[in-house]
Amino acid sequence: MKNKLIAFLTVALTWQVYTAAADAVSNRITVTVRGHGPDVLLIPGLASSSAVWDATASHLENHFRLHIIQVAGFAGAPPQANAQATVIQPTVDAIDAYIKTNRLQAPRVIGHSLGGLMGGMLAYQHPEDVGGLMIVDSLPFFGALFGAKDPAAVIPQATAMRDQLLAQTQDDYAKNQTAFMRSLAKSPDGCKQATKWAVASDKSVVARAMYEAMTTDIRPRLHKIKTPVTILHAWDSLTGIPQAASDPLYQENYAALPNKKIVRIDDSFHFIMLDQPDKFAAQVDIFLK
């Protein structure tokens, strides 16, 4: 996404803040607050629900105050301001505004997939916002998954994928998402949940956010992120990707990140928190110590 577009996408935020568990609402995100203690932000991925963090929230809420984000247009949430134009940068801006409006002091941030990319963007654009970052199965340049060296190389493919998605009927979209989710969530229950969220997502918002994610490259800015970063990535032999190829993908793409720890979670597809909840919870505990 080009930074020069941000000026045309400024969002006026109106927050509803309560002292206990409550909802804070803008036209880009909804934030549900649970628990008491140090602040932790949880950002879901593309076409995902904030409910992807339910088990994590139950595990943490007795010791942390959790700010669980729902992106407008995903998982049945009304698209609101995400109904047109760009999605990712304005959502990052909304998260920054939420942190500052509520005077959160350098909260820890955990982001899955697209949420991990947004967490990285937040960390280099607003370093004061992030006291620690956990990135869950996400890359600083998703185009690397398609063999692209830079955004220009992946634009034709990203454009074709976006336009194909936009052209689908709702029935075709639902069928394709149902099939696709089988490659992203290994556990039957997790796959069922992820499929439900994807099918309920606004097709236009998903298509545009997917294009933006594929063509956004924050690798040149990783050196600006000084806060500690934990990167979890999934691997399973059923994906057909050799372990010898999976590990270097993350090591190479995050090479410029100065203060990082990369951890592989085996026997899991993309939704680590659904496929390996105990392993995921253990890594979250280590991160939050």
Language-model regions: role of each:
Residues 274-286:
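Post-His helix in hydrolase/transferase enzymes
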Residues 228-268:
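Conserved loop-alpha-helix segment in the C-terminal half of the alpha/beta-hydrolase fold
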Residues 145, 149-150, 166-223:
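Conserved alpha/beta-hydrolase catalytic His-Asp/Glu region
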Residues 34, 67-110, 114:
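Active-site loop/oxyanion-hole signature of alpha/beta-hydrolase fold enzymes
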Residues 124, 131-168:
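Flexible "cap/lid" loop of the alpha/beta hydrolase fold
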Residues 118-122:
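Hydrolases whose catalytic domains are alpha/beta-hydrolase-1, hotdog thioesterase
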Residues 265-277:
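Catalytic histidine-centered segment of alpha/beta-hydrolase-like enzymes
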Residues 32-80:
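Conserved HGGG/HGGXW glycine-rich cap/lid loop of the alpha/beta-hydrolase fold
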